[in-house]
């Protein structure tokens, strides 16, 4: 059993990867002439389209399967752009809505219960309007004519259907966050494997608090810094994913056991009711510093022993506090348990430990940023990336381990920028488990760019001894940069917990532009080589992708 687990761990590891504020909300009966607007942000009442974001009348939320008897308090939220003769129907029952109301409204049979679980103004219907747990179609009409229609499938208990670009179900216990602007800041930029001391350095001086949000935590160097911070009197804790691809490594078990023995709190997020497919961020809060990374807390990542990664240290207490708010949310529900409890329920796997040695080509550098924004997934990160790409004027640089599909929403936005005349470059990993698929997608996108005569180039990386493989998830658009854990696939954007920062700074963009340019260089080919892969090779690539690595790809593309 151990040998099988070892094989699976090695292969998978290499191939991998709301409810509103509770409070008092006005309740209005059917006869009420108007309903006052609640405290709802634009992001919650907008629907993404391919051409932009528009306010319009729509069904925006459905909560049909509450974890209470008879689903009392169930509701559907609609937003109305103008007064009128509005109705909502499921094909069996029809609800008349307030004629003079504009804005969002939660329609319910049980207003006094609903007002405690939503921030929206609540509207009591006198009809026997009930939402189906098994799924149904809801239609919003004005003067008897359809304005919007949605169909939802079977609802898991506690999940809410949320109207956004992905029209996703939001698990119980998860509050979708808005993008939070935390103001100007001093930002230190660095890359890995060049400067492995940088992610750890803020921890070594912390005296008040250190909290780490991680996918995995296997770094003895970071663990030592955490224990020393704890000994200095700081409040120290770690949150890791409970079911990483390949399993929990023996090294991680040893590291976490040591942390707990030394008094550090370790949380594990997972289980059948997990709010996320993977808890996948890589960040640290150290006093008033925030560290946000593309790399995992292990030798191959923060240890500088293998992967090309990007990272930033942000000297700004508002950024640190916002990350701590995310951390408290993620550690504060029933899908999170202590490491002491969790470790008794799992078997560990032997996994290889990276031990590469690389020269320092890029040193850390401090800059001034005009604005820093904290992005999270699920919720706002994908929208922020798409919005940024839509605003591109001159240049887009994308570094990713893999692209799931040319049809992924962020990828489509990058292609659309190129079609507007923006110079777009995409650099993908050459890791053995993704090289063939990345080569195929690069060839496809490059051929499309050639045929359409727009400035897009996609290349599979050639590290040439500078690092082991690309693991960075970085984006530069003109003078704005995004650094974080977000992979460009639907599961990362919509199912995983991801954390990134968006930095408005010409200096930061210039730093990563220089790193990207150096990594883009190759000794073997010019940038168009991958455009002319023979059809037979592409067929072979497709067969390999479908056959030998299909399972691993499905698992890992979501969690690298």
Kindly give the residue locations of the regions a language model identified.
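Glycine-centered short loops/turns at secondary-structure junctions
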Residues: 233, 421-422
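HKD-type phospholipase D/PLD-like phosphodiesterase module
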Residues: 124, 134-135, 143-157, 177-206, ...
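Haloarchaeal acidic low-complexity proteome signature biased toward cell-envelope/secretome components but also
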Residues: 1-60, 146, 165-190, 328, ...
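N-linked glycosylation sites
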Residues: 39, 55, 85, 100, ...
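Solvent-exposed beta-edge/loop recognition patches
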Residues: 68-74, 94-163, 472
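A structural motif detector for short, solvent-exposed N-terminal "entry" segments of globular domains
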Residues: 25-94, 130-132
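Short, aromatic-rich amphipathic segments at membrane interfaces
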Residues: 502, 506-534
């Amino acid at each position: 059993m151990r040998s099988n687990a070892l094989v699976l761990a090695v292969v998978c590891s290499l191939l991998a990867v709301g409810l509103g504020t509770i409070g008092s909300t006005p309740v209005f009966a059917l006869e009420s002439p108007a309903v006052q607007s609640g405290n709802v942000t634009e992001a919650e009442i907008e629907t993404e389209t391919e051409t932009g974001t528009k306010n319009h009348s729509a069904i925006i939320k459905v909560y049909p399967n509450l974890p209470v008897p008879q689903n009392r308090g169930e509701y559907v939220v609609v937003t109305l752009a103008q007064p009128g003769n509005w109705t909502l129907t499921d094909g069996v029952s029809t609800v008349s809505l307030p004629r003079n109301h504009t804005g969002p409204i939660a329609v319910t049979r049980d207003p006094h219960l609903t007002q405690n679980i939503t921030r929206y103004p609540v509207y009591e219907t006198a009809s026997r309007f009930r939402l189906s747990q098994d799924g149904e179609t809801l239609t919003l009409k004005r003067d008897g004519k359809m304005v919007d229609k949605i169909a939802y499938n079977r609802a898991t208990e506690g999940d809410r259907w949320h109207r956004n670009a992905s029209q996703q179900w939001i698990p119980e216990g998860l509050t979708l966050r808005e993008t939070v602007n935390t103001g100007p800041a001093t930002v230190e930029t660095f890359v890995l494997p060049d400067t492995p001391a940088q992610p750890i350095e803020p921890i070594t001086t912390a005296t008040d608090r250190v909290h780490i949000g991680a996918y995995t935590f296997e770094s003895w160097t970071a663990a030592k810094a955490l224990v020393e911070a704890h000994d200095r009197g700081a409040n120290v804790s770690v949150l890791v994913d409970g079911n990483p691809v390949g399993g929990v490594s023996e090294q991680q078990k040893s590291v976490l056991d040591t942390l707990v023995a030394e008094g550090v709190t370790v949380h594990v997020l997972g289980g059948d009711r997990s709010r996320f497919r993977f808890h996948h961020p890589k960040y640290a809060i150290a006093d008033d510093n925030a560290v946000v990374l593309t790399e995992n807390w292990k030798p191959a990542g923060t240890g500088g022993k293998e992967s090309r990664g990007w990272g930033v240290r942000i000297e700004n207490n508002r950024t640190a506090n916002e990350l701590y708010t995310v951390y408290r949310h993620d550690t504060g529900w029933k899908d999170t348990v202590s490491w002491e409890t969790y470790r008794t329920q799992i078997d560990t796997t032997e996994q290889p430990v990276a031990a590469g040695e690389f020269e320092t080509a890029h040193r850390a550098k401090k800059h001034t940023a005009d604005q820093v924004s904290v992005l999270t997934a699920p919720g706002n990160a994908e929208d922020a990336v798409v919005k940024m790409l839509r605003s591109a004027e001159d240049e887009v640089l994308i570094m990713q381990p893999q692209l799931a599909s040319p049809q992924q929403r962020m990828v489509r936005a990058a292609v659309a920028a190129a079609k507007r005349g923006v110079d777009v470059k995409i650099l993908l990993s050459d890791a053995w488990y993704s090289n063939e698929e990345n080569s195929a997608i690069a060839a496809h996108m490059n051929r499309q760019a050639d045929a359409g005569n727009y400035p897009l180039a996609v290349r599979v990386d050639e590290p040439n001894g500078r690092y082991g493989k690309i693991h960075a998830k970085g984006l530069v658009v003109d003078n704005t940069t995004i650094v974080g854990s977000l992979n460009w696939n639907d599961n990362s954007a919509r199912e995983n917990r991801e954390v990134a920062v968006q930095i408005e700074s010409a200096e930061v963009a210039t730093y990563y532009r220089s790193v990207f340019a150096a990594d883009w260089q190759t000794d073997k080919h010019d940038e168009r080589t991958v455009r002319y892969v023979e059809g037979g090779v592409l067929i072979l690539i497709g067969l390999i992708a479908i056959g030998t690595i299909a399972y691993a790809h499905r698992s890992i593309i979501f969690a690298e």
